[in-house]
């Protein structure tokens, strides 16, 4: 049984990746019985993340009506740090957005003895509400779970029940605060066994988000080559050198890799903001770009 296995190696690398991200910006219901990975159709990459814009939630509509910045909060683990970096890079030139890093490394929905994610999200929202919440967890959760004196194996029925309850509570909290919610899935992993566990995680969360009516942003098709295999480089662009997309650990991405994953989501967010502006009609001017 994969019961309470230590993901120390992943977490340690996450710390290094987080430091790299910071330095980069300073410088510039069913039981899933099997944890087997499914291979995406190569053509799925073009559509991954590029879906129709979602209708604006109450806080987003209010932000537009009031002419204030749209506050986006990214919650997650060390991979969430990278999602924040990619989304920040995509939206930073638009003065109408503020993208906040609210992720915590070494966390997950199986690790509530280290950090209760619901309590952490609530405390952060109490300090500074968000209009849009982007969630990405899972790299630390391919292990058993311990709850109320009992341990349960990864992807067992009780594991799924407990994680579903915890995730549902977090999504419910965000919605009661008026925020739009997105869930970002994980990309393909280099090591086959870990990848099988991660793709089982992706299927689990995709089903949970569908049940909660939360948009699920798929990143798997953007992280493979034409054969559906792990791709360490970004797709080649005419006249440009290929750029590395994955970190050396085979788990995390490089900054260009995270930016690549977030193109679709940033477009969807812009689309929702455009809808909110159209619904609001003439009103306060958009936030001006800050100097410097």
Identify the function of each model-found stretch.
Residues 2, 15, 19, 25, ...:
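Catalytic His-Asp segment of secreted/periplasmic serine-dependent ester chemistry enzymes
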Residues 70-78, 106-112, 153-161, 170, ...:
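Second-shell loop/turn segments in exported
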